[in-house]
Amino acid sequence: IIAASGGHNVLLIGPPGSGKTMLAKRLPTILPPLTLEESVEATRIHSVSGELQPGMALLARRPVRSPHHSASTPALVGGGSIPQAGEVSLAHYGVLFLDEFPEFTRSSLEALRQPLEDARVTIARAHATVSFPASFTLVAAMNPCPCGYYTDPRRPCKCTPLQIDKYLSRISGPLLDRIDIHIEVPGVPFSALRSQTDGTPSSAMREQVLAARDRQRHRFDGNPI
């Protein structure tokens, strides 16, 4: 709810089966709807990129992009001889979900720093420089170690301290600094998940997010924030 209310980037760290992917996929369901201005701008990007579905005039929902960790740097942030928008721009005003975060190439991860800082991507070529908007909420998920079970009480970890350090070092400090919220997601037995019946529905969470954003608009009314 905090991430959705403030547009904060999130890093989820936990063993396999802890629900990281499920949490990430539920975030878009509690985000407020696109405004008309946001919808027009996001639709333009999808249209010029050939991503707009036939017969769709405007995007009705916030875009959610989840590229595979094998995606190249140009595919992620944009590029090519004729510059094209990448996943970060296709996620404009929406969510960019990066599962297996450390498995992306170092160059791809470092290329995320500019859009996370400036909400734009600049692609320089010999004949021109092109800038694409990229204001998105990053949701990244990763295991705590190569085998995935370093923090899981259900299974022993097989990794050495050196392997764990090397794995975690794939994500640089400057990139981590741009991710506002880091959450450790503990491993939970499936039986425990099934027994939970008193959870808060997405509709109720969305109302809380809408109320929080409304308070923010009133609080900063007249300020260029």
Spans of features found by a protein language model:
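Walker B catalytic acidic pair
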Residues: 93, 99-101, 111
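Peripheral, non-AAA+ core regions of ATP-driven protein-machinery
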Residues: 1-10, 124
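Walker A/P-loop
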Residues: 10-54, 118
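The Walker A (P-loop) glycine that initiates the GxxxxGKT/S ATP-binding motif of P-loop NTPases
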Residues: 14, 78, 100
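Catalytic P-loop NTPase motifs of RecA-like helicase/translocase cores
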Residues: 98-105, 148
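Conserved alpha-helical scaffold flanking the Walker A/P-loop in AAA+ ATPase domains
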Residues: 1-3, 57-63, 68-96, 129
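Basic, amphipathic alpha-helical bundle interface domains used for macromolecular binding and assembly
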Residues: 83, 107-225
